[in-house]
């Protein structure tokens, strides 16, 4: 009973929050559904399906053989792990986690390597960093590319910092399966992508409802206002920080109107690298059966490191 007390209390608090602020929760859920249907499904589903086809046809295995020496030296993982790192950086959240889950499920990597890869292989793609953050917030694709570059460098740095003391990862825990034909690979990939995108939608809708309900309760505005008063930073800065800590897209949207300063660029970089609890939940659903503890530690470190790099780089450039 005592062991589960926090979970019981949190569940009861959420139930009461949604009960007393049901109208706000309903509107937030509707906004989350709209975000999922109009932005996330069109932008993520094709990438998930394409990555699934490549994995099922053995393209990742072929790339892994070429990347194996560098992957072992830099990260202490197999070549498949390095291939997932590149997939995650190109496709965005949570493609890296989904790819790790697929490789673990088909026996290409072990449980230990899979959980280690979640430290640094699930990242934002350039489309979101440039489009939503660079152009959408700062009005510049150039700033977006710089922030995504720092994001990629910081992810690699976390992977190197927590390098596994192995020689290129372990052997597969299952014998390699026969490569399916293209039709079977496409069908399986699309079905898996559909399941993953539905899970992502559930998390986005839930966290959108949560943010709306907390807003009606007065959080995060009360805490953001107190910090803004004490530190002297804009209220919108801390509102974006607290919102983005929960859900990335909402946090980036809350940054609209912030002046272009090293501090605001560092904030955007932190949110991009941390990803938000919503993205962490999506990663857990996409990589079912794997523990997320290492991932949370790695993403928090990546967020702090990338924010510091962004602040220094912006201070030099501006």
Please identify what each model-predicted range represents:
Residues 1-10:
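N-terminal membrane topogenic signal
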Residues 2-3, 138-178, 283-318:
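Juxtamembrane and boundary regions of transmembrane helices in multi-pass small-molecule transporters
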Residues 9-22, 29-49, 53, 148-230:
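Selected transmembrane alpha-helices and immediately adjacent juxtamembrane segments
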Residues 19-30, 56-60, 131-133, 141, ...:
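Transmembrane helix-loop junctions in multi-pass membrane proteins
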Residues 42, 46-100:
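Membrane helical hairpin/interfacial module
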Residues 59, 190, 194-272:
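Transmembrane helical segments that form the transport core of multi-pass membrane transport proteins
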Residues 63, 85-86, 117, 144-149, ...:
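Hydrophobic alpha-helical transmembrane segments
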Residues 74-138, 240-259, 265-289:
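Alpha-helical membrane segments and immediately flanking helix-loop junctions
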């Amino acid at each position: 009973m005592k062991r589960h007390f926090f979970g019981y209390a949190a569940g009861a608090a959420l139930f009461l929050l949604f009960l007393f602020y049901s109208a706000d929760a309903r509107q937030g859920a509707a906004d989350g559904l709209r975000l999922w249907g109009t932005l996330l499904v069109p932008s993520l589903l094709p990438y998930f399906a394409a990555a699934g086809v490549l994995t099922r046809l053995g393209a990742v295995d072929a790339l892994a053989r070429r990347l194996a020496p560098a992957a072992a030296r830099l990260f202490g993982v197999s070549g498949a792990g390095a291939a997932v790192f590149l997939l995650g950086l190109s496709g965005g959240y949570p493609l890296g986690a989904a790819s790790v889950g697929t490789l673990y499920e088909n026996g290409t990597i072990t449980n230990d390597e899979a959980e280690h890869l979640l430290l640094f292989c699930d990242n934002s793609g350039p489309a979101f960093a440039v489009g939503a953050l660079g152009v959408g917030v700062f009005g510049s694709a150039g700033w977006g590319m710089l922030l995504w570059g720092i994001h990629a460098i910081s992810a690699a740095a976390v992977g190197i910092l927590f390098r596994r003391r192995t020689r290129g990862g372990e052997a597969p825990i299952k014998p390699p399966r026969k490569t399916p034909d293209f039709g079977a690979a496409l069908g399986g990939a699309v079905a898996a992508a559909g399941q993953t995108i539905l899970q992502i939608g559930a998390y986005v809708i839930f966290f959108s409802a949560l943010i709306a309900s907390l807003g009606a309760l007065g959080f995060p505005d009360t805490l953001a206002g107190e910090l803004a008063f004490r530190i002297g930073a804009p209220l919108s800065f801390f509102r974006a920080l607290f919102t983005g800590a929960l859900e990335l897209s909402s946090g980036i949207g809350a940054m609209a109107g912030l002046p272009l300063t090293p501090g605001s660029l560092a904030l955007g970089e932190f949110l991009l690298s941390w990803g938000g609890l919503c993205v962490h939940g999506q990663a857990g659903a996409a990589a079912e059966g794997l523990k997320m503890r290492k991932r949370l530690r790695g993403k928090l470190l990546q967020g702090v490191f990338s924010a510091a790099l962004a602040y220094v780089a912006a201070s030099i450039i501006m």
